[in-house]
Amino acid sequence: MVTLMDKIVIKDLYLQYSDQTESLRGINLTIPANQISVLFGPAGGGKSTLLRVLNRLNDLTDVRAQSGEVLFDGLNILEKSVDVINLRRKVGMVFATPVALPFSIRRNVLYGLELAGEHRPRVLSEALERSLTQAALWDEVKDRLD
């Protein structure tokens, strides 16, 4: 039973990658609102996979099978009808090791701006160069942005 105090409720979550690796099996978990929660376990135990499920980053990977429910504020975020862009505005994450999305350098850098609705070429071009310059990467990658 989901209560108003439950922010995230995971029911019988299963995930298998295309290489047949079962990453998650029978996961049941309730994360209350306004609380700090911790996931810990051995390397390769599925912690990062579980976190990627919460904002549907696994949609960008080679998942063979996924089942169960993940309720975020009562909404099953695994349903195909869920607006993934809106979900990712609400559920963000920062991993210890940065993970680039499977896009070009340009698309990775500009992803947040485009997600927020910015599509003016000049604004995007300036933001791209400014961001990569501030990260001391412009000279290294300017010729291979796409």
Task: Report each predicted region and the residues it spans.
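The feature captures the beta-strand-to-loop junction immediately N-terminal to the Walker
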Residues: 40-42
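Short helical segment in ABC ATPase nucleotide-binding domains corresponding to the A-loop/adjacent helical element
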Residues: 55, 106-115, 125, 129, ...
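ABC ATPase NBD coupling module
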Residues: 63-65, 76-92, 115
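Short coil-to-beta microelement around the adenine-binding A-loop and adjacent beta1/P-loop entry
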Residues: 20-22, 84-85
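Conserved ABC ATPase "signature" region
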Residues: 71-76, 117, 121-142
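Conserved catalytic motifs of ABC-family nucleotide-binding domains
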Residues: 61-62, 97-107
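Conserved structural motif at the start of ABC-family nucleotide-binding domains
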Residues: 8-10, 24-26
